[in-house]
């Protein structure tokens, strides 16, 4: 295959990889559940065999079973609630109706650049309901517990809210512990059996969400619509698995239950943010389901048998906040995997680590991207220089190649043979010019996911009109400059021998300008910087080569 053919193929491949393959990989090719589903069984209840002795890995239960009462968000409208504020949370509301956390806003994350209102991650607002609740279940039936506020006390800089309630012969004391600087909330329940017989109790910590944040908003040219929304979970046997809301909605209301096997967590994921329940017991089970097609629920439940006049303590950790690796890595095994950079996450994590350290020095993510690009070009300079020297040599051979084309214009086989002889005589590899592009592909993909998934770059400004590097350039200045840089770079490269190839190459800058117009401006900034450095390197090397090899 000719060098120009390969160069065109690589350029087109980059576009296809981002627009078609990479963008929807997780959604189009969900994780393989074959092994798990082979052990699935049908049970009459979500809470069947809730004790730790069960061996079932995954259970798909009957949609009509009494898993939990279907969520009625409107019941919180007139119910009393307690409001707590911390250094990171604004207006955390705990309903006295059942102890659910029905509201939590993030002080450090505004809704948008134009609306500086703190983003509500948990909310009971109609149309965007998303709550965290802890349900007490007796004999596989949820019981209604109305709580009373016992006040908030401060211990070691932490706010501790205590609620008490009783139902069905049980006395429940629930505490919520808030750390002023952290997004995790410790939820502990002390359940006392005041009856004369043993009681089988389950504590079900769950999320209920009244909508899919992604909805049907996928757009081929909207990079942010490629991000994952749905359920993620981890167990001792399965370190990380995801199920999209779209796939869960196809289960006809049948919940899926998974053994945690001693450790695990369950979470709702959306772009930049995660809410996770982390049970502290070793016999917890994880589940997820869809109710009535428009309410999604996921949680972890723990069972215990409480003897008469005895108590049982069951606790969990609730995390609701940004997907920042440093926040998650110590909370639970594999929780940091919710920061998912895709197939090339190893390279993405290295790139982000370097960018983060540079940002700590320069204080601007745009400058960090530029400096990371310079560093990458410096590392790969020996390979690039070799490629540019080969291209310079090819450029000097153009007159001889044109003469061969004129001589053998009616015999393509002979032309190909003569050109290969020329390349061999001059020790030129026509494919070497593709090497820099090959190197860029994994780096480009890795940086793409860093810019798309890292919450640190959400609403991060650069200069002038670029107020958010995670969003597209509002005036398309960077994509146009990137297209012009591609055009200039083509002028420095050897012209394609085939007129048709030349026309295709001529239109590629226009095509890529159009494609990059919808990409995050930080990514376009990287590509533009990369092109400008490449042009400078190629121009200097070409001039030097021509000056030292004149005949």
Curated annotation (Swiss-Prot):
<dbReference type="InterPro" id="IPR001708">
    <property type="entry name" value="YidC/ALB3/OXA1/COX18"/>
</dbReference>
<comment type="function">
    <text>Required for the insertion and/or proper folding and/or complex formation of integral membrane proteins into the membrane. Involved in integration of membrane proteins that insert both dependently and independently of the Sec translocase complex, as well as at least some lipoproteins. Aids folding of multispanning membrane proteins.</text>
</comment>
<dbReference type="InterPro" id="IPR038221">
    <property type="entry name" value="YidC_periplasmic_sf"/>
</dbReference>
<feature type="compositionally biased region" description="Low complexity">
    <location>
        <begin position="50"/>
        <end position="59"/>
    </location>
</feature>
<comment type="subunit">
    <text>Interacts with the Sec translocase complex via SecD. Specifically interacts with transmembrane segments of nascent integral membrane proteins during membrane integration.</text>
</comment>
<dbReference type="InterPro" id="IPR028055">
    <property type="entry name" value="YidC/Oxa/ALB_C"/>
</dbReference>
<feature type="transmembrane region" description="Helical">
    <location>
        <begin position="504"/>
        <end position="524"/>
    </location>
</feature>
<keyword id="KW-0143">Chaperone</keyword>
<comment type="similarity">
    <text>Belongs to the OXA1/ALB3/YidC family. Type 1 subfamily.</text>
</comment>
<dbReference type="GO" id="GO:0051205">
    <property type="term" value="P:protein insertion into membrane"/>
</dbReference>
<keyword id="KW-0813">Transport</keyword>
<feature type="compositionally biased region" description="Polar residues">
    <location>
        <begin position="33"/>
        <end position="47"/>
    </location>
</feature>
<keyword id="KW-1003">Cell membrane</keyword>
<dbReference type="GO" id="GO:0032977">
    <property type="term" value="F:membrane insertase activity"/>
</dbReference>
<dbReference type="Pfam" id="PF02096">
    <property type="entry name" value="60KD_IMP"/>
</dbReference>
<feature type="transmembrane region" description="Helical">
    <location>
        <begin position="361"/>
        <end position="381"/>
    </location>
</feature>
<dbReference type="Pfam" id="PF14849">
    <property type="entry name" value="YidC_periplas"/>
</dbReference>
<dbReference type="InterPro" id="IPR047196">
    <property type="entry name" value="YidC_ALB_C"/>
</dbReference>
<keyword id="KW-0472">Membrane</keyword>
<feature type="transmembrane region" description="Helical">
    <location>
        <begin position="3"/>
        <end position="23"/>
    </location>
</feature>
<keyword id="KW-1133">Transmembrane helix</keyword>
<feature type="transmembrane region" description="Helical">
    <location>
        <begin position="431"/>
        <end position="451"/>
    </location>
</feature>
<protein>
    <recommendedName>
        <fullName>Membrane protein insertase YidC</fullName>
    </recommendedName>
</protein>
<feature type="region of interest" description="Disordered">
    <location>
        <begin position="33"/>
        <end position="59"/>
    </location>
</feature>
<keyword id="KW-0653">Protein transport</keyword>
<dbReference type="GO" id="GO:0015031">
    <property type="term" value="P:protein transport"/>
</dbReference>
<dbReference type="GO" id="GO:0005886">
    <property type="term" value="C:plasma membrane"/>
</dbReference>
<keyword id="KW-0812">Transmembrane</keyword>
<dbReference type="InterPro" id="IPR019998">
    <property type="entry name" value="Membr_insert_YidC"/>
</dbReference>
<keyword id="KW-0997">Cell inner membrane</keyword>
<dbReference type="InterPro" id="IPR028053">
    <property type="entry name" value="Membr_insert_YidC_N"/>
</dbReference>
């Amino acid at each position: 295959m000719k060098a120009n053919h390969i160069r065109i193929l690589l350029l087109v491949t980059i576009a296809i990889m981002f627009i078609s393959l990479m963008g929807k990989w997780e959604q189009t090719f969900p994780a393989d559940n074959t092994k798990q589903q082979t052990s699935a069984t049908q049970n009459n209840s979500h809470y069947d065999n809730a004790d730790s002795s069960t061996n079932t890995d995954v259970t798909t239960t009957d949609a009509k079973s009494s898993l939990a009462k279907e969520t009625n968000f409107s019941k919180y409208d007139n119910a009393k609630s307690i409001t707590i504020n911390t250094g990171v949370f604004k207006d955390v509301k705990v309903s006295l109706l059942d102890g659910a956390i029905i509201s939590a806003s993030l002080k450090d994350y505004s809704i948008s650049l134009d609306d500086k209102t703190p983003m509500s991650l948990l909310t009971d607002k109609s149309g965007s309901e998303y709550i965290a609740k802890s349900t007490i279940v007796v004999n596989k039936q949820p019981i209604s517990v109305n709580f009373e506020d016992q006040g908030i006390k401060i211990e070691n800089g932490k706010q501790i809210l205590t609620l008490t309630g009783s139902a069905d012969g049980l006395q429940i004391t629930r505490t919520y512990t808030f750390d002023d600087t952290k997004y995790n909330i410790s939820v502990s329940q002390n359940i006392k059996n005041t009856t004369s017989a043993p009681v089988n109790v389950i504590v079900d910590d769950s999320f209920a969400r009244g909508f899919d944040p992604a909805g049907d908003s996928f757009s081929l040219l909207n990079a942010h619509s490629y991000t994952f929304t749905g359920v993620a979970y981890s167990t001792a046997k399965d370190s990380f698995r995801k199920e999209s809301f779209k796939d869960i909605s196809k289960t006809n209301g049948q919940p899926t239950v998974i053994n945690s096997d001693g450790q695990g967590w369950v979470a709702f994921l959306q772009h930049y943010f995660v809410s996770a329940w982390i049970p502290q017991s070793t016999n917890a089970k994880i589940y997820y389901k869809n109710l009535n097609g428009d309410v999604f629920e996921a949680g972890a439940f723990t069972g215990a048998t409480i003897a008469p006049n005895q108590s049982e303590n069951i606790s969990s950790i609730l995390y609701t906040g940004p997907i920042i690796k440093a926040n998650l890595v110590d909370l639970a095994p594999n929780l940091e995997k919710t920061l998912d950079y895709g197939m090339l996450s190893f390279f993405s994590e290295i790139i982000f680590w370097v960018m983060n350290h540079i940002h700590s020095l320069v204080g601007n993510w745009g400058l960090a991207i530029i400096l990371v690009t310079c560093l990458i070009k410096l590392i790969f300079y020996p390979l690039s220089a070799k490629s540019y020297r080969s291209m310079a040599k090819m450029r000097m051979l153009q007159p001889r190649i044109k003469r061969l084309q004129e001589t053998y214009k009616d015999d393509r086989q002979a032309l190909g043979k003569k050109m290969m002889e020329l390349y061999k005589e001059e020790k030129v590899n026509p494919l070497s010019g593709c090497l820099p592009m090959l190197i860029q592909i994994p780096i480009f993909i890795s940086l793409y996911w860093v810019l798309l998934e890292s919450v640190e770059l959400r609403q991060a400004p650069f200069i002038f009109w670029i107020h958010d590097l995670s969003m597209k350039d509002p005036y398309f200045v960077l994509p146009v400059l990137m297209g012009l840089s591609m055009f200039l770079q083509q002028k420095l490269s050897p012209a394609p021998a085939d007129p048709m190839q030349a026309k295709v190459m001529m239109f590629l800058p226009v095509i890529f300008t159009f494609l990059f117009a919808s990409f995050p401006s930080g990514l376009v900034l990287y590509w533009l910087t990369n092109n400008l450095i490449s042009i400078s390197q190629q121009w200097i090397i070409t001039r030097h080569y021509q000056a030292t090899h004149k005949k």
